[in-house]
Amino acid sequence: MTTLNEAMDSMMARFNPAKAKGVNAVVQLNATGEGGGQYFTAISEGKAMLTPGVSPNPTVTINVAAQDWIDIMGGKLDPTRAFMAGKLRITGDLGLMMRFQSMFS
C-alpha cells in the first residue's frame, strides 16, 4: 500500500468484530505531512465505521506522519516501537489503544 487511503482501507478490511465486543469508542487519526489526512473510526456494537474528517469528541487521538501510519498498517513499522520512538503520539485512553491493535489485526 502506498497511500493513506489504501492504509485505512486495509485497516478496515482486517477489523475483527469479536475483538471489539463491549467497545464503544471513537479513534481520531491525524496523519501529517505529504499524503496526510484526518479520519476517525467509530467502534460500537461490534461494528467499525471509518469517516474522513475530525470527530468532535474522540476517545483517543493518534498523531503520526502519514508515511509512518502507512508503514504501520503495511507491517513495515511496529506500532509499539513507533510509539516508543515518538513517531506515534497518542492522547486519551491508552488502554483502548492496546485493544485497537488487536481489533484490526
Model feature map: region roles:
Residues 1-105:
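Feature captures hydrophobic
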